[in-house]
Amino acid sequence: MAQGFAVGFDPLGLGDLSSGSLSSLSSRGHLGSDSGSTATRYLLRKQQRLPNVPPRGIRASSPMGRVILINSPIEANSDESDIIHSVRVEKSPAGRLGFSVRGGSEHGLGIFVSKVEEGSSAERAGLCVGDKITEVNGLSLESTTMGSAVKVLTGSSRLHMMVRRMGRVPGIKFSKEKTTWVDVVNRRLVVEKCSSTPSDTSSEDGIRRIVHLYTTSDDFCLGFNIRGGKEFGLGIYVSKVDHGGLAEENGIKVGDQVLAANGVRFDDISHSQAVEVLKGQTHIMLTIKETGRYPAYKEMVSEYCWLDRLSNGVLQQLSPASESSSSVFSCASSAPYSSDSLPSDRMDICLGPEEPGSRGPGWGRADTAMQTEPDAGGRVETWCSVRPTVILRDTTIRSDGPQPGRCLDSAISESPKTALLLALSRPRPPITRSQSYLTLWEEKKQRKKEKSGSTGEKGALQRSKTLMNLFFKGGRQGRLARDGRREAWTPDSGSLAKTCPRLDMEKAGGMGPVQKFVTWRLRRDRERGRALLSARSGSPSSQLPNVDEQVQAWESRRPLIQDLAQRLLTDDEVLAVTRHCSRYVHEGGIEDLVRPLLAILDRPEKLLLLRDIRSVVAPTDLGRFDSMVMPVELEAFEALKSRAVRPPALRPARQDTPPKRHLITPVPDSRGGFYLLPVNGFPEEEDDEELRERLGALKVSPSASAPRHPHKGIPPLQDVPVDAFTPLRSACTPPPQLPHVARRPPRPNWLLTEPLSREHPPQSQIRGRAQSRSRSRSRSRSRSRSSRGQGKSPGRRSPSPVPIPAPSMANGRYHKPQKARPPLPRPLDGEAAKMGAKQGSSENGTGGTAEEAAMKTPSGELKTVTLSKMKQSLGISISGGIESKVQPMVKIEKIFPGGAAFLSGALQAGFELVAVDGESLEQVTHQRAVDTIRRAYRNKAREPMELVVRVPGPSPRPSPSDSSALTDGGLPAAHQPLDAAPVPAHWLPEPPTNPQTPPTDARLL
């Protein structure tokens, strides 16, 4: 039974989705994006589906930016394809899972288990070779790349997997290459039927001759372009000849093959070497053979098949029937590979991430249909993957060296070669009847009638030409002659009048714009009336426009319309516009054409396409078409005109789209002020470097049984052991993180602070509030300036801590107004009394310095603690810093469960941090301590992390319980990913009772 498998591309993802949920496992899982779509035509053949088996659709996203749609009943054929098994696999004490995977959406496949180690935890859990992993820890792997799947599988020590027992593993087999040639004689594209070399397929009886070309050193131009080379598996062919050039004068034609030049054979020479031989020579002797064709592009078809698993776990091909003949028709092509270098045996596909340099700009889209007829006894499922089109470049032989040809996706007006290829690939218009409505006998009879009417029947009733006489100039005889050549139509004549198309051509020579417009309006009204009356009379000749003419006009205008549509619309919209226009040309119905077009062309730029679509509308439908389209076109014209004329400075402030909003947060500095920075405004170059290192670690050594392929275009399938990433990750890359839908902005913690002034008169408070409302004052850096002239200078601030001045640009520092956050409750009365007592003592100068000296004196023993960096987060929050007068040292405020600090058990809340990985944390600011600890924990190359802490002694020390209570109770810190930006803090005003600053705390990950 023949089974069909179709492979295509769905640019907007409108194809059938799989039954599983489509999950995006990593926002950075792709290695690149599509650099340009090639204009390939779609040749999709109908596939024969199995009876009573619905096809399964898989939409997969490729790292090259493609989207592959595979309609294949491969999984439904299996007896156990619908059985879902739940498998729980835990890592061994050595950190191994014990199985390898293969596949990935970049190959249009799912994630399959290809190897299971004996005695591993995966084997004990019941995982088998050939199982398809559909879900891991609640995340679907139906449409997932191999890189994202490996991150999910290695990101947790316990995996709860849902597998489908398929019993087979996908493999790959390479088939032959095919070259598409441009037949110069017949002006069409020819696809070779076999994978033989061009020298075998070319005509051996071609005329060979020797041509001598003489040039000068001043004016070196041979006047022809060459195409081909050894890297493409082709010879050197002439693809273009300059008109009137040296090559054309000596008889060189397009399609000739260059066999040798100055004694150098071109049978086995690269393109660049051929250019070097030809250029720079004043006398060139060429050996030319007339072949009448030159290569357009190449294609290489790779066929996927399935490997069956045996009892010992060794993979074997299901059936040799996959070697059966297959007919593949496609206009896609591959990267330049030689057919001799392709391996004929089967090899695995490397599923690791590719290097960015292995992708070229020629990747595009292609559609392929494949029909395979295996043996009746075997059961084989294959699908075909066709490489994207790569147009072979042309090189002009000039003194300045080769110039690469243009790609297929360039405009027709910019590339004559591309226009020629497209023109040759289009089918020829069908041979139709002449455009004349009259036969030869009828035409002679009509001439006699016109002659007799113009000479002998002067008094016959003629149609009034009063309106026409107002516009047309000339003598009366000319008008009568034109009137005599025109037949009047009456309803009782029973047939339509024959209008001569030569009449309009004769009038066009002596008409102005107004006359042409009136003529067009009269002809349109007359044809509309004829259509209405003929529809009423039921005449079979009611179809005024000839269908063959309209179809022919549509076929001639179709390439230009599609070219403009591809510049303005998406691929699906281009197909929809083409489908509606083709349906109108063959079936009619102007309303059915205009309504969907107006729905698709929903922007002023897109409405420019209506100008070209108007050319395929029948004359009888032009009035209705204009009445429906003209208002929309006028609005679009006004919109485009306003965009082009109005300068950017004069555009209104309010636009259709709302302005972008940026979340800002204050970041403290060492002088008591703060900066306003965006929440997500931190650079991500470090994260990109970490991602590249992580992707580079996914490379594995090639399989011993699989032969090495010298090219990087189609990666061979390889087994990816998931355990190979654990040591690499611990050595050089951060641990993989679970994918998330969208990164939430980090929740900032509270930074409790107080101003440093010692006097707080009521007048200054009132004056400070007025300053905050007017937003014209900024915070001063010096306490001495704040005590004098508080309202005289705009650069000085009030010592009142309650109001916070409005944002200003003084010294490049921003300040947040008081309305940004509601005030927190005041401290307890007892604490306020203590703080007041301290304030009084400090003001009197009795005891303030002693207390500060006691607090600054370090007490306690030093202790070195080592922490493992294998966990995703450190899990501590710290408080204090040099900017705090209460707690200038950095202390551990809280330890969060699940972090590295919690699992070690050696750290406790209240420990003072002295150094981390040899870098001191004494006499540093709070933000400097946060950055130092983050940087040390992210450096996975240094394992483990060494922390020097000071265990508090028996002497009483002030505890930052207030800040801890406010931080932990009022605003709990959120769990953040590893590569999140440093958590900033906000200023929070406190009552003016404590002249000192409480410690700050921040969450460290």
UniProtKB/Swiss-Prot annotation:
Major location category of this protein: other
Location of the region described as Disordered in the Swiss-Prot/TrEMBL record: 353-378, 700-859, 949-1005
A GO biological process held by the record: auditory receptor cell development
CDD domains assigned to the protein according to its UniProt record, in alphabetical order: HN_PDZD7_like (cd07358), PDZ1_PDZD7-like (cd10833), PDZ2_PDZD7-like (cd10834), PDZ3_PDZD7-like (cd06751)
Keywords of the record: Cell projection, Cilium, Nucleus, Repeat
Cleaved signal peptide residues: none
Any one annotated GO CC term: nucleus
SMART domains (UniProt xref): PDZ
Compositional bias of kind Basic residues: 770-786
Subcellular location: Cell projection, Cilium; Nucleus; Cell projection, Stereocilium
Record field: compositional bias (Low complexity): 787-799
Start and end residues of each PDZ domain: 86-168, 210-293
Ranges of biased composition (kind: Pro residues): 989-998
Nucleus in keyword set: yes
Function: In cochlear developing hair cells, essential in organizing the USH2 complex at stereocilia ankle links. Blocks inhibition of adenylate cyclase activity mediated by ADGRV1.
The protein's assembly and partners: Homodimerizes (via PDZ2 domain). Component of USH2 complex, composed of ADGRV1, PDZD7, USH2A and WHRN. Interacts (via PDZ domains) with WHRN; the interaction is direct. Interacts with USH1G. Interacts with ADGRV1 (via the cytoplasmic region). Interacts with USH2A (via the cytoplasmic region). Interacts with MYO7A (via MyTH4-FERM domains).
Record PANTHER family: PDZ DOMAIN CONTAINING WHIRLIN AND HARMONIN-RELATED (PTHR23116), PDZ DOMAIN-CONTAINING PROTEIN 7 (PTHR23116:SF29)
Protein name, entry field: PDZ domain-containing protein 7
Organism: Pongo abelii
Taxonomic lineage from the root: Eukaryota, Metazoa, Chordata, Craniata, Vertebrata
Gene label: PDZD7
